[in-house]
UniProtKB/Swiss-Prot annotation:
Spans within the Extracellular topological domain: 1-21, 117-285, 389-543
Cytoplasmic face residues: 43-95, 307-367, 565-659
Function: Involved in cell fusion during mating by stabilizing the plasma membrane fusion event.
Predominant place of localization: membrane
Membrane topology: Multi-pass membrane protein
Sites where a glycan is attached: N132, N184, N209, N220, N249, N281, N403, N424, N446, N516
Entry keyword set: Cell membrane, Conjugation, Glycoprotein, Membrane, Transmembrane, Transmembrane helix
InterPro entries in the record: PRM1
Descriptive protein name: Plasma membrane fusion protein PRM1
Species of the source: Lodderomyces elongisporus (strain ATCC 11503 / CBS 2605 / JCM 1781 / NBRC 1676 / NRRL YB-4239)
Length: 659
């Protein structure tokens, strides 16, 4: 008889066509397509040299550069003119203030002093003249009286001498002359000493001619001292104003945008090369892993087919095969299912028939295809997501590297720093030249004011001395002049501390605007790869979702299987109840056996069919009185049965068929 089935070698010759290998090959194709697509997307020029040929931006940057320098020069000139005006105003106001205060109060003091001294001098002269007239007249009268008294006394003395001579009889003219000289009374020099000398009146006349020349000279000297430092600063500022462009700005050059653009192009192209290498390396390793998995799947398929052939052979040679179709199909199901065979036959695990049915339902050929599609789809999606992940990491690394060492950003930042340094240096130089002498000026003005106050005190003291009006004059001078001068001194100090030119630095907005220029920031260009990767990632997510749906459909078979079991159990229960009511148990038993395959109602209307022939079991041979010591299959000719003649195939024993 010609064999029309495939034996084991013929089956193994098609093992490479198993569904797992085919699906894995599709995964390889999918990865190759993804690799080529990523390389094509990465290789596209997101920037090229043509972008750097646009000179418009260079002209704009040059214009901004020149505008900044010109504005600095204009600001310097304006600042100098403004400061000169301020200094001239302060100088004139200070001179005017000093002249106003000091000149006014010199005039007032002169009037007060002159009026007071004139009154005092006139009174003194009148008193002196009156004293001289009165004292001299009195002295003359006293002199006349003394002379008369002296004559009287002398006459009296002469009489006394005559009487004494009369009585004594002796006469001496010398004694009479002696007494006359002693009794001669007169004011003599005392009369001249009583009158006030005429030199006093001469001194009074000279004192009338005093003046306030000291205060007037002090006013003029103070104005000259105060004006001198202001004049010095103003002259220096005028000289600087004429040389406003003498600061060296040759080291400041505008950003060369073309060079920066070419650097960006080269940097982006280098990053693209790195990303392409990452895609190639990752895909290469994934393809190697898939090749190993495919080889393993071939080995697994080879092993599965080999085991399946052996299981079928064991099933054919199985002696204890049930004598019913249900039992036969049950045994065939166990041998045909690798999982059930391993659990029951190899490990001897006792499994309920319903559990066996559920496992068979979920591991059927149709369900297995769905399961295989789901698993292989998940593997494919995971590999693609891993490839996209590695590319994403490479892009992030490149962007991070560019952020850490961005030459164009450093170029822009360096330009801004250089410009700000130039502005600060220029500002410092201008302030030193403009206001460097302001401190000296304020110091000189303060010293001048202090010297002026000292000289004023000396002048007032020299004029009024310890007179009764000296204290009042000092108080008036301090309240009217001294306090004002203290305010001037405080104003000079404030001027030295606060007057300066502030040149504004280049605003940070310009640096941010430079950062926003795309071809100056390669990391911004690299950000364009992220939307592409997101697009691929979304498509792979869709594939993963479809694969999960396949697995969900396969898992749904468990629910469907359990529902079928419950339906069969309900039908069996109703069929068993109907058969028992009819008075027989044979049908009920037949129904129980047959409900493992079909519905009872279908069995009643389905005609009986002759089953497939198979070898007799030991019980059947005993039933048919066959010797049980003979083998079931023996190709030798001496094992022929005496009951049945040999068939056309020599060496083959044909046993009765069990229908």
């Amino acid at each position: 008889m010609l064999r029309n089935y495939l034996d084991l070698p013929e089956i193994l010759s098609q093992v490479y066509l198993n569904q797992y290998t085919i699906l894995l090959v599709l995964v390889v194709v999918k990865l190759i397509l993804l690799k080529e697509s990523l390389i094509d997307a990465i290789s596209k020029q997101i920037i090229n040299d043509a972008t750097c040929n646009d000179d418009n931006l260079q002209h704009i940057l040059n214009g901004v550069h020149d505008a900044i320098l010109k504005n600095i020069d204009k600001l310097q000139y304006s600042g100098i003119v403004f400061v000169v005006l301020i200094l001239k105003t302060i100088r004139e106001l200070t001179s005017f203030f000093i002249d106003l205060l000091l000149g006014t109060y010199v005039c007032l003091l002169t009037a007060v002093v002159v009026g007071t001294t004139e009154f005092a001098f006139d009174a003194s002269e009148s008193i002196i003249q009156a004293v001289n007239v009165t004292v001299v007249a009195a002295a003359d009268e006293i002199e006349d009286g003394l002379r008369g008294l002296s004559n009287f006394i002398n006459d009296l003395v002469t009489g006394f001498n005559a009487i004494r001579t009369f009585f004594t009889g002796s006469a001496s003219t010398s004694d009479a002359d002696l007494y006359r000289d002693r009794i001669n009374l007169s004011l003599g020099n005392l009369k001249d000493k009583i009158s006030i000398p005429s030199t006093v009146l001469m001194d009074i006349q000279n004192a009338r001619n005093f003046s306030m020349n000291e205060l007037e000279n002090l006013n003029n000297e103070t104005q000259s001292l105060v004006n001198s430092p202001f004049n010095l600063v103003i002259n220096k500022l005028d000289a600087i104003k004429l040389e406003i462009n003498r600061y060296d700005n040759s080291s400041l050059q505008p950003i060369q945008i073309r060079d920066a653009c070419l650097q960006t192009v080269n940097r982006v192209q280098d990053s693209q090369t790195v990303l392409i290498k990452v895609v190639e390396n990752v895909s290469k390793w994934f393809l190697i892993v898939l090749a190993i998995i495919i080889a393993c799947s071939l080995a697994y398929a080879f092993y599965i087919e080999l085991r399946r052939w052996k299981r079928l052979s064991e099933f054919i040679n199985e002696g204890d095969v049930a004598d019913s179709e249900v039992g036969y199909r049950n045994e065939h199901n166990i041998y045909d299912n690798a999982l059930l065979y391993t659990m029951i036959k190899r490990f001897g695990i006792s499994v309920n028939e319903r559990v066996i049915w559920v496992i068979s339902y979920m591991s059927s050929k149709m369900a297995g295809i769905v399961f295989a599609f789901g698993i292989i789809g998940i593997i494919s999606a995971v590999l693609q997501l891993l490839m996209i992940y590695f590319v994403q990491q490479a892009v992030d690394d490149e962007i991070s590297t560019m952020n850490n060492s961005n030459e164009n950003f450093e170029m822009a930042s360096s330009y801004i720093r250089s410009m700000n340094n130039y502005i600060n240096t220029t500002q410092s130089s201008i302030n030193d030249e403009l206001f460097g002498d302001i401190i000296d000026t304020s110091t000189k003005v303060n010293n001048t004011i202090a010297e002026f106050v000292d000289n004023l005190d000396s002048a007032v003291h020299s004029i009024f001395g310890e007179s009764i009006i000296a204290s009042a004059v000092n108080t008036v001078v301090y309240c009217t002049i001294g306090r004002k001068l203290e305010k001037i001194e405080a104003g000079c100090n404030w001027l030295a501390e606060n007057v300066k030119i502030d040149i504004p630095e280049v605003p940070s907005e310009i640096l941010r605007e430079l950062q926003n220029i795309s071809f100056l920031q390669p990391q911004n260009l690299m950000e364009n790869f992220k939307p592409i990767l997101d697009l691929y990632r979304n498509s792979v997510h869709l594939e993963l979702l479809i694969s999960l749906i396949f697995l969900a459909v396969w898992a749904l078979q468990l629910i469907i299987g359990l529902m079928i079991l419950l339906a069969r159990q309900g039908i069996n229960a109703s069929g068993a109840g109907g058969a028992g009511g009819a008075g027989g148990t044979g049908d009920a038993e037949g129904c129980d056996n047959y409900t493992d395959n079909k519905v009872i109602l279908m069995r009643r209307v389905t005609p009986l069919q002759i089953g497939s022939p198979h070898s007799l079991t030991e019980k059947e041979r005993q039933l048919y009185q066959f010797p049980i010591s003979k083998p079931r299959f023996d190709r030798s000719s001496d094992t022929l049965s005496s009951f049945y003649p040999p068939t056309s195939t020599p060496g083959r024993i044909e046993y009765p068929l069990h229908i």
